[in-house]
């Protein structure tokens, strides 16, 4: 069990009524809480969401606070400071004065910094500190008026092969405020991608998806991501750039296995972080299994850190892998099914 969940279980006497667990890890916490606690989970991680449903828990997969009332909330501190700001805001917009909010996180994950942010809503108390985790309690003294989701957007402009795109990114989305180096290395090659049904695996804020849609109005883009904030950001990016929704298919995925089949191309700057930890499972799975989702002669385009052994993985499953460029620590890899 996640050590943060162990801390919650040890202090479960503080919990009562309808309790919302926010950003909770996918473990046995909900099933081990006392039955008199009516626990629900709000998550934006699709893999975790599926895990909670399979375990029989009440779970919500969304970027917005669930549409029901709660007596208490437990916030598992996210990696992103901006995302924590958003979560605190929506919690303080939905809970009432004198209700309880709990904050739990790893010390290396910024729980002490997060606790300081909690202080602006009332007096806080540290309830537990063990297994490199801390649990804090707040009795709400100050609430907030809900702001629209759009007010949390960051926008910036990207120039791609003579096309100017406006990128919209919500809190917690990869490269929320600027173009990342890996995607920048990949962008000049997007005009070579085969037209048709194209999947953007790990779509993030929708930079790759948006360019491919604007480049050819007959392209159908399957924007795939595990994160609800990424999918919502991609939809907002399409809208901001005047691209019709008929070109966009948004799909939450746990990995490449959930992707559509018979695709003309898969393009990806694959994810490698899960919370504060590095995790290459999704990107390695993409290299190993992408061919199953492509038509004959379908294309795989990936940008990845040069130190990763993806060319070997891709060659093993495709029979070949071409390195299109090696620039600024990143390689653009190409293979044809």
UniProtKB/Swiss-Prot annotation:
One term under GO cellular component: cytoplasm
Pfam families membership: MTS, MTS_N
Reactions catalysed, as given in the entry: guanosine(1207) in 16S rRNA + S-adenosyl-L-methionine = N(2)-methylguanosine(1207) in 16S rRNA + S-adenosyl-L-homocysteine + H(+)
Known EC number: 2.1.1.172
Cellular compartment(s): Cytoplasm
Lineage: Bacteria, Pseudomonadati, Pseudomonadota, Gammaproteobacteria, Moraxellales
The UniProt record lists the keyword rRNA-binding: no
Role summary: Specifically methylates the guanine in position 1207 of 16S rRNA in the 30S particle.
Keywords for this protein: Cytoplasm, Methyltransferase, rRNA processing, S-adenosyl-L-methionine, Transferase
Gene expressing this chain: rsmC
Organism listed in the record: Acinetobacter baumannii (strain ACICU)
Keyword flag Cytoplasm: yes
Identification of the protein by name: Ribosomal RNA small subunit methyltransferase C
